[in-house]
């Protein structure tokens, strides 16, 4: 599945998830279970119709699973892009704030007050990025 590979290559694969299930890695099986039932010559009556209905529903569920997995992988890739953009924005804002503070400090304060402010600023914890964890 191509989106899953892209997600892994981008380093955005959710931890602890493991590999994709075999049912989503390989193409669906060809053929029809009804053909096997007919060739065996067994008289199954209503069981044949029930098996065919179950087979069809399993195929529908597999298609939905593949579609949902593709959408989740696409969302994971978008979240990775947004995270990178957020890091860039936060870094730019931090640089702007530092420049503004430097200009204000230089205009309004003496040397002792500048040192006090630098010490107090270093005691604040660094801004942390939100954790955009994803679970599939």
UniProtKB/Swiss-Prot annotation:
Residues 92-136 are annotated as: Disordered. Residues 101-121 have a biased composition (Basic and acidic residues). InterPro entries: DUF4530 (IPR029202). It holds the Pfam family DUF4530. This is Glutamate-rich protein 4. The lineage of its organism: Eukaryota, Metazoa, Chordata, Craniata, Vertebrata. The gene is Erich4.
């Amino acid at each position: 599945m191509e989106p899953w590979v892209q997600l892994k290559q981008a380093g955005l694969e959710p931890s602890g998830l493991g590999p994709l299930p075999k049912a989503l890695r390989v193409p669906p099986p060809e053929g029809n279970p009804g053909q096997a039932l007919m060739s065996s010559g067994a008289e199954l009556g209503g069981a044949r119709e029930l098996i065919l209905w179950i087979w069809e529903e399993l195929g529908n569920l597999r298609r939905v699973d593949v579609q949902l997995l593709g959408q989740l992988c696409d969302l994971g890739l978008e979240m990775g892009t947004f995270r990178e953009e957020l890091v860039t924005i936060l870094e730019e804002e931090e640089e702007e704030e530092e420049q503004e503070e430097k200009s204000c400090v230089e205009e309004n304060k003496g040397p002792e007050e500048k040192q006090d402010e630098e010490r107090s600023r270093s005691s604040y914890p660094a801004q942390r990025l939100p954790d955009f964890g994803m679970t599939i």
